[in-house]
C-alpha cells in the first residue's frame, strides 16, 4: 500500500471560494435557479423561526410582569403560535422544494463525470492518477449525503447562522462587549481545531482511498460469479479471507488514528464550551442579583447568550464542514479538468470515405508503458498499404497488441510518428480517426442489450437486414434464430432476468458481426478465433477474403497456420519486426517464424495421431 510522504502533503488545487464560484456556475448553466432563490428563502425562514421561538417565552413573561389583561396575554400567545406554525410549514415546504435543485446540480455533475470517463483519451485509462481521481469523484457524488449535494446544505446552514448571528448580536448589544468577544474568540479557536482535523483527513485521503479500493476489489472477487469456480476449485477461500482481514486491519489502524485526532478536537471544543457558557451565565446571574434585571429580560438574554454562542459556533463549524466538502469537490473538478493528451473537438476534422484509400505508416515508433523499464515497441518502421491483409504474429509480450493500439490511435508513441496518408494523426480529431477502424479485440465487451443493439451499437435506426447479413458472415445466424426473440433477445443477465448467456465462441462471433456491421475501411482482428473450435475457426478463415473485400485488415494471432491467407506477415520479437514476408517466404527463410510454425505443427500432428 502506498503511503509515502509525497502522498500526504498534497494540497487542494482549488480553495473554498473558487469551488463555490464553480458550483454556482454549474447551477446557473443548468438553469437550476432554485438553489439560489429557495436556498436563501429557507435560510431566512429557518433563522426567523429560531428567533421567534427565542422571543416567545420572554414576551409572555413580560405581559405577566406588567399585569396586562388576559386578552393581551392570549393575543401574544396566539400571535406567536400562529407565526411559529406558519414558519414551520413554510420551512418544511421550502426544504422539500430545495431538494430538487440540489439533486439536479448533483445529477449534472454526475453526467459530466460519466462523459469524462466515457470520452477521455485512452492513455488516461492507464494512468493511476486519473483512475484515483475518477474513484474519488464517484464517491463525492454517489448519494444525496455526499459532498456534491451536501455543499448546498452547508451553505444554507451558514446563511441561516449568519442571519441568526446578526439578529442575536442586536439583542445582546446592551450587554458587556467583552462577553461577546469571549464567545467569538472561543468559537474561533474551536473552529480552527476542527479545520485542522479536516485538513488531516485531506492530507491522508490517498492512504484511505488505497485501503478502500483494495477492500472493494477483494469484495468483488469474493462475490462476482466470474471468480466463483476458481475460488472453489483451487481452494482460494482462505486466501481471499486473509487478504480481506489483513487489509481491514490496516484500515482499522488508519481509522483509529483519524478518530483519535477527532477525539482531541472534541475535547478542546467541550472545554471551550464550558468557559464560554460559564462566563455568560455568571454575568447574567450577577446582573439579575445586583442590577435588578427583570426575569423576562434574564430569560431573553439567557437564551440569546446561549443562542449567540451556537450561531457563532454554527458559522465556524459549517464553514469547517464546507471546507471539507470543497476539498472533495476540488477533486471532482480536478478529475473533470484532467488534461487530454488527444485532440477531440478541437482537432482537425477527418471524414471517413470508403472510396478513399488509407495508408497507415509508423515512422521510427517506440512506445514504453508508464513505469516500464524498457520499450514495448522500439524504433519500428512499418507501412500498411491500402487494401492489404496484414498479419502480425509473435510470442506473448512481443508487442502485437501494443502495435495495434498505436495504429488504431489508442496510444501515441513515446517516440516517432503514426501517419495517415503521410500526415501525423495527432492534429486530427481522434474520434474521427477511430471511425476508420472496426475491431474485434481480445478483451471485448458485451452490452446488456439486445442482439441487434450489440451488433449495431445503437438503439435506433438499426438496419435489421444488415444485422442478419453480418451475423451470417460471422456464422451466428442459426444460434440467433433459435433464441426466443431472435434479434430482440437480451444478452446477459446482469440487467435482464430473461437474458441469454452466450458461450465464449458465440460471443466472439457476435463481436465479429459487430465489427462487420460498422463497415469501416480498416478491419482489426486481434485473436478473433481464440475461443472457437477448429471447425468454426476454419469456417471464419474461408470467409475472410469475403469479409475483408475492399478493406485494409490487420490480423493478430498466435496460430501461425491461420495467417496463410494474408498478403504479408510480420513476425514481431522484442518490439521489432524480426521477419517479414508471406507464409511460404518465411518458411523458406528458416528463421524464428519457421521454428515457431514447426513447433505448432508438431503439436497438431501429435494431437491428430492421438
Predicted segment positions?
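ABC ATPase nucleotide-binding domain helical subdomain, centered on the C-loop/LSGGQ "ABC signature"
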Residues: 417-419, 434, 452-497, 541-542, ...
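Cytosolic ends of transmembrane helices, especially the final helix of ABC transmembrane type-1 domains
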Residues: 236, 280, 299-337
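Extended non-transmembrane interhelical loops and adjacent amphipathic helices
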Residues: 1-21, 103-149, 211-254, 326-339, ...
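Helix-to-loop junction immediately C-terminal to a conserved catalytic motif
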Residues: 408
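Primarily ABC-family ATPase nucleotide-binding module
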Residues: 233, 336-388, 469, 546-549
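Transmembrane helix-loop-helix hairpins at lipid-water interfaces of multipass membrane proteins
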Residues: 36-93, 169-201, 275-282, 286-296, ...
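Membrane-integrated ABC transporters
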Residues: 1-50, 70-75, 130-166, 214-216, ...
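C-terminal portion of ABC ATPase nucleotide-binding domains
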Residues: 486, 542, 549-550, 559, ...
Amino acid at each position: 500500500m502506498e503511503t509515502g510522504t509525497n502522498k500526504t502533503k498534497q494540497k487542494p488545487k482549488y480553495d473554498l471560494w473558487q469551488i463555490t464560484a464553480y458550483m454556482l456556475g454549474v447551477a446557473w448553466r443548468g438553469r437550476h435557479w432554485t438553489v439560489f432563490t429557495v436556498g436563501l428563502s429557507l435560510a431566512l425562514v429557518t433563522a426567523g423561526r429560531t428567533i421567534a421561538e427565542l422571543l416567545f417565552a420572554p414576551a409572555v413573561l413580560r405581559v405577566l410582569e406588567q399585569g396586562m389583561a388576559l386578552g393581551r396575554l392570549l393575543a401574544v400567545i396566539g400571535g406567536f403560535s400562529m407565526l411559529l406554525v406558519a414558519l414551520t410549514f413554510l420551512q418544511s415546504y421550502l426544504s422539500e422544494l430545495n431538494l430538487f435543485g440540489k439533486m439536479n446540480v448533483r445529477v449534472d455533475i454526475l453526467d459530466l463525470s460519466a462523459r469524462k470517463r466515457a470520452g477521455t483519451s485512452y492513455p488516461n485509462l492507464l494512468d493511476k492518477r486519473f483512475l484515483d481521481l475518477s474513484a474519488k469523484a464517484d464517491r463525492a457524488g454517489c448519494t444525496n449525503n455526499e459532498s456534491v449535494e451536501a455543499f448546498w446544505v452547508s451553505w444554507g446552514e451558514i446563511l441561516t447562522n449568519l442571519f441568526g448571528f446578526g439578529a442575536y448580536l442586536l439583542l445582546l448589544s446592551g450587554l458587556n462587549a467583552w462577553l461577546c468577544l469571549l464567545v467569538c474568540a472561543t468559537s474561533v479557536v474551536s473552529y480552527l481545531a476542527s479545520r485542522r482535523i479536516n485538513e488531516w483527513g485531506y492530507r491522508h485521503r490517498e492512504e484511505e482511498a488505497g485501503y478502500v479500493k483494495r477492500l472493494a476489489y477483494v469484495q468483488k472477487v469474493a462475490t462476482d460469479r466470474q471468480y466463483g469456480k476458481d475460488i472453489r476449485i483451487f481452494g482460494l477461500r482462505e486466501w481471499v479471507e486473509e487478504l480481506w482481514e489483513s487489509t481491514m486491519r490496516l484500515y482499522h489502524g488508519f481509522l483509529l488514528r483519524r478518530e483519535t485526532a477527532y477525539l482531541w478536537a472534541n475535547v478542546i471544543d467541550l472545554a471551550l464550551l464550558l468557559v464560554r457558557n460559564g462566563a455568560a451565565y455568571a454575568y447574567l446571574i450577577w446582573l439579575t442579583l445586583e442590577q435588578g434585571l427583570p426575569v423576562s429580560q434574564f430569560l431573553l438574554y439567557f437564551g440569546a447568550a446561549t443562542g449567540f454562542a451556537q450561531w457563532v459556533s454554527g458559522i465556524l463549524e459549517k464553514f469547517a464542514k464546507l471546507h471539507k466538502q470543497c476539498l472533495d469537490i476540488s477533486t471532482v473538478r480536478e478529475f473533470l479538468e484532467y488534461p487530454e493528451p488527444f485532440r477531440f473537438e478541437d482537432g482537425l476534422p477527418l471524414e471517413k470515405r470508403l472510396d478513399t484509400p488509407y495508408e497507415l505508416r509508423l515512422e521510427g515508433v517506440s512506445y514504453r508503458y508508464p513505469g516500464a523499464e524498457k520499450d514495448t515497441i522500439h524504433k519500428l518502421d512499418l507501412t500498411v498499404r491500402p487494401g492489404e491483409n496484414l498479419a502480425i504474429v509473435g510470442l506473448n509480450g512481443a508487442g502485437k497488441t501494443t502495435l495495434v493500439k498505436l495504429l488504431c490511435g489508442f496510444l501515441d508513441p513515446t517516440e516517432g510518428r503514426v501517419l495517415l496518408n503521410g500526415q501525423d494523426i495527432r492534429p486530427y480529431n481522434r474520434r474521427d480517426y477511430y471511425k476508420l477502424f472496426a475491431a474485434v479485440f481480445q478483451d471485448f465487451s458485451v452490452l446488456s442489450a439486445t442482439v441487434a443493439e450489440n451488433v449495431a451499437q445503437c438503439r435506433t435506426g438499426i438496419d435489421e437486414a444488415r444485422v442478419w447479413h453480418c451475423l451470417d458472415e460471422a456464422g451466428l445466424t442459426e444460434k440467433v434464430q433459435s433464441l426466443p426473440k431472435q434479434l430482440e433477445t437480451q444478452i446477459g443477465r446482469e440487467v435482464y432476468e430473461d437474458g441469454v448467456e452466450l458461450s465464449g465462441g458465440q460471443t466472439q462471433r457476435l463481436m465479429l458481426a459487430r465489427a462487420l456491421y460498422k463497415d469501416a475501411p480498416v478491419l482489426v482482428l486481434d485473436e478473433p478465433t481464440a475461443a472457437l473450435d477448429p471447425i468454426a475457426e476454419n469456417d471464419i478463415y474461408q470467409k475472410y477474403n469475403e469479409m475483408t473485400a475492399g478493406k485494409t485488415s490487420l490480423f493478430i494471432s498466435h496460430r501461425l497456420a491461420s495467417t496463410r491467407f494474408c498478403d504479408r506477415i510480420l513476425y514481431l520479437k522484442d518490439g521489432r519486426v524480426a521477419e517479414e514476408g508471406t507464409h511460404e517466404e518465411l518458411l523458406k527463410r528458416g528463421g524464428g517464424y519457421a521454428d515457431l510454425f514447426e513447433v505448432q505443427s508438431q503439436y497438431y500432428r501429435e494431437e491428430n495421431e492421438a
